[in-house]
């Protein structure tokens, strides 16, 4: 009888939350995504470059010749854009087991097919370095094909959710994140809701082939970006909505502090040619997300609700698909906020890459890239 009462109670709560989220879809409900002062709602005018038979272009990279972009997609492939009319072509993949990897979006097969997330080219060699959520840090040559694993563990602990990277070519090292020791990529929302703090920030020395943990205890370690002068590296902590700065040289070398606190959940971070940083927010931080992350009783209730992951994601993101990109200075000051407040064109963005007067915009969920003219 007690279990029946609890089930009925949770079902009622889920129904109430669903109604509140539906009301939020008008932009005025209590769970609606918050407004950001000074933001410009310009992304509805962005163009889209559709993917054919693929989805989730999480990360974006251009090769040393300026060709591309290249994107990693949900079925484990890395695609190259060859422009109109050629469109997209297969460039590389992270798993040799491709027999079952034909569906554009199949989270249950990610551990078989691979899920390439962060992408970075070595400007000298043309090699593409890949952070695959399931297969660790990999590399593939300029001709593409099957990527080769470089490292799958650090200090005796295997990677569980390799996420993003950046390359310091002068020091011959790669900085990258392992998001969680408990959750895999297809459980990303559970990692956030459980306030998991087992993420790591790692340095891989290409000469010694050794991986060293630089930071640990991170709450969803995510995007990585090296500063223009290489004096510091930034690492995104998604759950706390913060970006951390780890000093690599100078009097503060080896120490870290908060570089920026953001109004939403940051994913990847990318530096532009001026040394500024573009941060993509998966979503803004509304009331539901705040309560889930700060009130234990509310979080415990949410985790017990009999609702689908899709409905839970809708609750967490405020019921309105939207897109937010923030440009930060080298000191962490907010310079610009660009949005698609109602998700008319872009939504749930994962990365913003600035190149030749355009912003190329990825998403872990949608079947296209966004392109916005600055």
UniProtKB/Swiss-Prot annotation:
It comes from the Eukaryota. One of its GO terms (cellular component) is plasmodesma. Glycans are attached at residue 50. InterPro entries: 6-blade_b-propeller_TolB-like (IPR011042), Strictosidine_synth_cons-reg (IPR018119). Residues 1-18 form the signal peptide. Keywords: Glycoprotein, Signal, Vacuole. Gene3D superfamilies: TolB, C-terminal domain (2.120.10.30). Its main location: other. It is found in: Vacuole. Belongs to the strictosidine synthase family. This is Protein STRICTOSIDINE SYNTHASE-LIKE 10. It comes from Arabidopsis thaliana (Mouse-ear cress). The gene is SSL10.
């Amino acid at each position: 009888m007690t279990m029946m009462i609890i089930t009925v109670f949770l079902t009622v709560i889920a129904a109430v939350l669903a109604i509140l989220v539906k009301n939020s879809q008008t932009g005025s409900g209590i769970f609606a995504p918050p407004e950001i002062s000074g933001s410009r709602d310009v992304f509805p005018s962005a163009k889209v470059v559709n993917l054919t038979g693929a989805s989730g272009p999480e990360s974006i990279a251009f090769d040393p010749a300026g060709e591309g972009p290249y994107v990693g997609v949900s079925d484990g492939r890395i695609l190259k854009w060859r422009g109109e009319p050629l469109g997209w072509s297969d460039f590389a993949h992270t798993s040799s087991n491709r027999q079952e990897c034909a569906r554009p979006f199949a989270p249950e097969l990610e551990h078989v097919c691979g899920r390439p997330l962060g992408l970075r080219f070595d400007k000298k060699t043309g090699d593409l370095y890949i952070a695959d959520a399931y297969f660790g840090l990999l590399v593939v040559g300029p001709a593409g094909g099957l990527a080769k694993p470089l490292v799958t563990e650090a200090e005796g602990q295997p990677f569980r959710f390799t996420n993003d990277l950046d390359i310091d070519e002068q020091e011959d090292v790669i900085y990258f994140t392992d998001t969680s020791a408990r959750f895999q990529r297809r459980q990303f929302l559970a990692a956030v809701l459980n306030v998991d703090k087992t993420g790591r920030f790692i340095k891989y020395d290409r000469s010694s082939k050794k991986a060293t943990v630089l930071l640990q205890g991170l709450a969803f370690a995510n995007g990585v970006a090296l500063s223009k002068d290489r004096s510091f590296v930034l690492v995104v902590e998604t759950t706390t909505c913060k970006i951390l700065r780890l000093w690599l040289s100078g009097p503060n070398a080896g120490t870290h502090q908060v570089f920026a606190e953001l109004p939403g959940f940051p994913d990847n971070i990318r530096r532009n040619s001026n040394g500024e940083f573009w941060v993509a927010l998966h979503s803004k931080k509304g009331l539901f997300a705040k309560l889930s992350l700060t009130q234990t009783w509310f979080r415990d209730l949410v985790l017990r609700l009999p609702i689908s992951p899709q409905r839970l994601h809708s609750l967490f993101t405020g019921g309105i698909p939207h897109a937010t990109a923030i440009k930060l200075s080298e000191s962490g000051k907010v310079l610009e906020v660009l949005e698609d407040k109602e998700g008319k064109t872009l939504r749930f963005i994962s990365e913003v890459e600035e190149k030749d007067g355009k912003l190329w915009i990825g998403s872990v969920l949608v079947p296209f890239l966004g392109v916005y003219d600055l």
